[in-house]
Amino acid sequence: LHIGHVFSYTHADVIARYKRMTGKQVFYPMGWDDNGLPTERRVENYFGVRCDPSLPYDPSFSPPEKAPEQKISISRKNFVELCHQLTQADEVVFKDLWRNLGVSIDWTLEYSTISAHAQAISQRGFLEMLQRGEVYSSVAPTLWDVDFRTAVSQAELEDRERPGNYHRVAFKKADGSGSIEIETTRPELLPSCVALVAHPDDERFKALFGTNVITPLFSVEVPILAHELADPEKGAGIAMICTFGDTTDVTWWRELSLPTRALIGRDGRFLPAEFGSEQFPSTDAPSANAFYAGLEGKTVNQVRASIVEGLTQSGALIGELKPITHPVKFYEKGERPLEIVTSRQWFVATLKHREALLKRGEELSWHPDFMKHRYKSWVEGLNVDWNISRQRFFGVPFPAWYPTDANGTIDFDAPILPELSELPIDPSSDVPKGFSEAKRNQPNGFVGDPDVMDTWATSSLTPQIAGHWGTELFEKIFPMDLRPQAHEIIRTWLFSTVVRSHFQENSLPFKNALISGWVLDPDRKKMSKSVGNVVTPMPLIETHGADALRYWAASGRPGTDTAIDEAQMKIGRRLAIKTLNASKFVLGRLEGITIPSPAQITEPIDRDFIALLANVVNEATAAFNTYDYARALERTEAFFWTFCDNYVELVKTRAYGEGENATEAGTSSARATLAITLSVLQRLLAPFIPFVTEEVWRWWHDGSVHVAPWPVLAELGNVTPSRDSAVYEQVCEVLEAVRREKSTQKVSQKNEVELLKIDGPAELLGAIRNGETDLKNAGGVKAFELNESATLSITVTLSPLAI
């Protein structure tokens, strides 16, 4: 875990703490997203192992203490056991971090996405979608990571800028009348070419539509076709369609009903091919096969080099290569560019529900509102159904077996499904009803589905998993109120959860989405393990304290990227320490005094101050109710400092019952204002700095501040501002002038003022008269001179001894 997790988890926690204080029963679970490719890769590297599903389970296996240089092959069950072992150890560390941070999770609601409970929920959801026709199995072009050797979904892609070259290649016309030149960055796909394509309105190629050309090196006759996705401005304006270079190739292949000549295997190497066959017709099969024999089994880069050399020698490569830098699709956790491989996968039918899913996005309340456009853009840009199959090991298995006929051929169209009461099941070890283990992988027997679900296929059901789908609890909490998350997983976690809830419950899964930004490094670059600029949180907690770290996190507004800033953490630490000291100071003046009533607040300056406090309560509450926690903190913190720096200094003499003109009513008014304000501020700050507020709250209250009622105007009574409005603000302005003059003269703030002369409008002077005694005590003023004038003027004359 890094500082970015602390950032977003703090945002969720301050909301949970606020809601709890308003009297809500807060459902706040902790889920561990254990399964998936990152966990497998970590286990492989940590233990020095790799999974080989063909190996038998070894119950005595124990990984070496130090990971060997050469990875050890182990069975799937042994591998999964190591995944559980490592994730459980990680969770202990993670849990310790969240507790140190003060995240107020209900640990009785803890769950894991790989637990038996989560697997049963995931498998039930899959079976019910299958029954409703919302999920289907198909052999189709699939986005494929050749290192992980698994399918990935559109949501898991990212573009990375990579160098490349445009290759201008000549295709001879089939009628011998000349040639057509195309430009491509992937000449290695030439043996997979099935057509050329241009825009239907491109005058350069209109006369060629319906004619054929011959592929260089392989002599395969392919048509020239028209399609609106062809870009007249890109390359030569006419493109090569191959099976498959990118998702546009897939679209052309599907919409133009083209043949399949897929040659890249799951390991990223070129598969065998027989030119002259029905799949690879060639007018010069011997030559084509002779050339292709040198490509079979090679990597993409190796084949590219061989093809370019062959094109050069044949004269089909026109001119020099044109260097470019262009975006290349990668799996977000992968190291090599994605390929498109034909394979059998399970898909969720999302494309035909696009409009309904867009409508769901409009129904959802987004915080901040502009984040809805990211969801909308994602849904509008979908070009394939959601692939939920992964060819990996540590995940939720698909609950399906398939019968085999007398020849051992698998019938994928007639899956054998378990009863819901049998879930969770693992088809690689469990046996379907009516069969015995001896019939596994045999003719007239069965095979288990070998794949596991995409991690988002499980995480998309977090409301059902955490809420115990089908129970009274689930009926009570669904749909949930809030989904807090980061913006980069809108297209994955949020979208997939909306999809599943739309299908399963015909509703949104939650009413609000609170979206956090990224944490940036000091150079304002996104933190990334691969870049090496990740900051871990525990050293920061040890240095500055959890309250300080939370303060920094809560200062980042929803949806806004925020740089890590230890200076901001120091401010948070100062706030926590000041809360401690101010509480100690105020409570020292209230010792032995019962909690006062607002009715005791009678002095004009006190009434004005409480009126300002009421405004802060209103503003902080309104901000929290719109999930703008940063605004609530900003407003509360600003008022806290004016309370400490100004109000406490103004009234502390009166609160002691000391000074000239001291009265019992004046003392009582000051003490009541101090006590009520301290109580309110401690509660307003509690969601942000929970440790120090809990400490000071228990000094004078029973129970926890975190279940104390959130401040409301009713507890401030009927206190209204004084007749002379803005007494407190005007007195503070004068006090600041006194302090400024003392600082300018480089004398102690304790030094006295011989004369404080104030010229100003009558209303302002009336306000100052109402606070004259407090101002005299706080500023050390011996004498006042108040004169009416149109504008305010303050003259401070320090005592001679002070100069």
Residue ranges and their predicted role:
Residues 49-55, 76-81, 296, 538, ...:
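Short, polar/flexible loop-turn hinges at active-site or ligand-entry regions and domain interfaces
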Residues 148, 218, 334-336, 404-406, ...:
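Short Cys/His-rich metal-coordination motifs, predominantly Zn2+-binding knuckles/fingers
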Residues 4-16, 32-33, 118-121, 179-310, ...:
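Structured ligand/cofactor/substrate-binding pocket environments in proteins
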Residues 14, 64-70, 95-102, 219-231, ...:
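Active-site-adjacent bridging/hinge elements
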Residues 168, 384-457, 461, 503-546, ...:
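Feature 926 captures the class I aminoacyl-tRNA synthetase adenylation module centered on the KMSKS loop
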